[in-house]
């Protein structure tokens, strides 16, 4: 008999997610069983962990398992576990709300594309709510370990706007999830169909999955029923990798991550010696929707001597590799380890170093063996990997090898060029790796600073991601070659520079008074004014010195709300350009000032993508055209 019953409304995001999920995941509806068995496995892991310090929680029943049964007459499937169970408060928190930051943003990102939605929802982790894909009503009976029998909870919902919760009596610890199937989902009321799904998705989990099967006598007559274990139920990572198939690795990844898509690659390693541990690492194919959310949970599942300790142990993987999924099973950490203990622990530091190296080796191998797959990975996770040079000094060169860029060597904006590729194509006598940063690929590709490099056939990396400028403040050289911005006023081409011709000397002398007039006019607004012979089609550019903050870095600071020091540009004029020649001959000071201002504004617009006073610029153009 239920008591203390109340009806509550779902959190608005739950209602929205349920509707989207039912429609988007319908083609992959059998995953409901995978998700519910995974939840049962997690409940068993949590009980084992808590029972380390309080064995009484086992209540004399330490054989943990999950049981799947069905009733064809009632149209129900029941998934039962004897794991940690839930209290009334936990039921309301876990089944009535989505305790994830950024949920609203996630739901906004979902559009009309069902295939895309299916992938996104899979990354989000539907868990318990997947039951409503096949059920029009779900009943949950649960009792938390250590609670009295009359402290159990009944939860029910039709998956629409509300759910009910009440107190009931339940003798056994754990959770029963009862699915009342829709009329058109009765295909799942079949022992062999359920066996097939369990074998496909849950064969590898370290918890026995049992089904109630009929027993027959020697004459073939039905004589009873028994619970039969139908999965291997050994922890997959404890097996030799030679005994694990690719399909098993993929299925285990989906169990760990709740992802729908196969991983790109994985590595399974058992290490013995000073540090004894087993690791199983995966590189996902798709970035999670909240990869750049500050509260995004990441890290590995941590086991100690095969006992589950915690999810999302971020201490073992650096932040720039936060997309890595998998687990580590250590023999050396204490069973009572906490996140605080992990923080300043020599064993943790050694494991982190080893797992970081292993992760980078996986990516190096992928890049070498399958360039196409690696570029797919780069499109998903390249921005995160670019955080590496700043975060991981010890592995900076290794991370740098994994970076990919757009370049003047290729026509498109795709980032396919490695620094090693660039070095192989360097001109004889070229000592630096040249790059330009801009707001967009188009802006970088059409920058006037490229004119000299295009003329000489020198390749330039075209960088337009917001993180690039920050990354390059840490990645200043690669393989003994300096990385050099072509927008710097003190650009040094070394042996590739043109020797000063007699014509250039004459131009410098002839334009000397013109340069002084421009300096006097602009005063403190620029650092200096000078002629440049690095332009072919453009009359003027602005550039910064090596010791100054670049334009893109200043924008990055401004976007982050940081104080931005004033950037004073060097104003460079092309004496070969007809406009510069024309302006140099203007005697009227007002007209001269208008033309100089116009040339400076053009150069600033090309460099920064915007002007402080665009209205004045337009007014000046109209005046000079009139």
Swiss-Prot record:
Region (A): 1-339
GO terms of biological process kind: DNA damage response; protein folding; response to heat
Annotated GO CC locations: cytosol
InterPro entries: HATPase_C_sf (IPR036890), Heat_shock_protein_90_CS (IPR019805), HSP90_C (IPR037196), Hsp90_fam (IPR001404), Hsp90_N (IPR020575), Ribosomal_Su5_D2-typ_SF (IPR020568)
MF (Gene Ontology): ATP binding; ATP hydrolysis activity; ATP-dependent protein folding chaperone; unfolded protein binding
Entry-linked Pfam families: HATPase_c_3, HSP90
Keyword Transmembrane helix on entry: no
Cell location: Cytoplasm
Stretch list, region C: 556-626
SUPFAM superfamilies with a match to the protein in the record: ATPase domain of HSP90 chaperone/DNA topoisomerase II/histidine kinase (SSF55874), HSP90 C-terminal domain (SSF110942), Ribosomal protein S5 domain 2-like (SSF54211)
CDD domains according to UniProt: HATPase_Hsp90-like
Assigned keywords, A-Z: ATP-binding, Chaperone, Cytoplasm, Nucleotide-binding, Stress response
Region of interest called B, as start-end residue ranges on this chain: 340-555
Protein function: Molecular chaperone. Has ATPase activity.
Sequence similarity: Belongs to the heat shock protein 90 family.
Subunit comment: Homodimer.
Name of the molecule in the record: Chaperone protein HtpG
Gene: htpG
